[in-house]
Amino acid sequence: MQTRNAFSWLKKQITRSISVSLMIYILTRTSISSAYPIFAQQGYENPREATGRIVCANCHLANKPVEIEVPQAVLPDTVFEAVVRIPYDMQLKQVLANGKKGGLNVGAVLILPEGFELAPPDRISPEMKEKIGNLSFQSYRPNKTNILVVGPVPGKKYSEITFPILSPDPATKKDVHFLKYPIYVGGNRGRGQIYPDGNKSNNTVYNATAAGIVSKIIRKEKGGYEITITDASEGRQVVDIIPPGPELLVSEGESIKFDQPLTSNPNVGGFGQGDAEIVLQDPLRVQGLLFFLASVILAQIFLVLKKKQFEKVQLAEMNF
């Protein structure tokens, strides 16, 4: 009886441990996956400044390319693809928050014209769903459904991101018109160099906060360094803290200048932005164009037939 009770108690403890571990993993993954877009969402009402600069560039300092591909024109109430490409060398490894090396993640923000929005799931074709994969898109704000964010997601799998977009219908949305509209995109690969509060991440270069002699370098147990700089003229000491990740470039006894790099720059990623144009096409205009082209073709056909008939008449008169 005691053996059975002990076995039952052990089984409950194992089940509880597995459940707790699974909950921690899920919460951690959720926190990590939602952290980066939230930085911009919490700090800025609009991700695109009046100058045209997308605010993600405030934290991702390196400039890298990004590409966007959209149709030249779309009809009202139509689902189409906006493809964002974030190219980078897949062999690169970035510095993670714990100082270790890992793969790069990517993220993107898509700023659509007013009225354009994420297509509902029941309007997305199976072919488009296959291109989208397991990506989860969200609106930048509940009242800004035309601005979409995604990421961070693994770069090796999602360096090309397909957004399913639904075009508006001017017949139901009076503030939308049949015009040419701009679309703006921002895309990053890798972690940022500065947090929204202004503090540096461990994915950037660290500079000396004072000039003098490097009198002491202490390697911390969990990684990183404490560098003591002594100013010989004033006799004061300054301690610079280096987090785990960047590679140290100075040594004890070395004379350094103010703002001199103490570490290498481990950043291999960066942010880029681009734009494209799309025309919301009036179906009646398309029908009118088709009618015009058809009339031109018919006119050409009748002209050819008339010419051949005229030639036959001329030939008959000559034979007569």
From Swiss-Prot:
Residues 1-35 form the signal peptide. It is a single-pass membrane protein. Its cofactor is heme. One of its GO terms (cellular component) is chloroplast thylakoid membrane. Keywords: Chloroplast, Electron transport, Heme, Iron, Membrane, Metal-binding, Photosynthesis, Plastid, Signal, Thylakoid, Transmembrane, Transmembrane helix, Transport. One of its GO terms (molecular function) is heme binding. One of its GO terms (biological process) is photosynthesis. The chain crosses the membrane at residues 286-306. It is found in: Plastid, Chloroplast thylakoid membrane. Heme binds at Y36, C56, C59, H60. Binds 1 heme group covalently. It holds the Pfam family Apocytochr_F_C. Belongs to the cytochrome f family. The 4 large subunits of the cytochrome b6-f complex are cytochrome b6, subunit IV (17 kDa polypeptide, petD), cytochrome f and the Rieske protein, while the 4 small subunits are PetG, PetL, PetM and PetN. The complex functions as a dimer. Component of the cytochrome b6-f complex, which mediates electron transfer between photosystem II (PSII) and photosystem I (PSI), cyclic electron flow around PSI, and state transitions. This is Cytochrome f. The gene is petA.
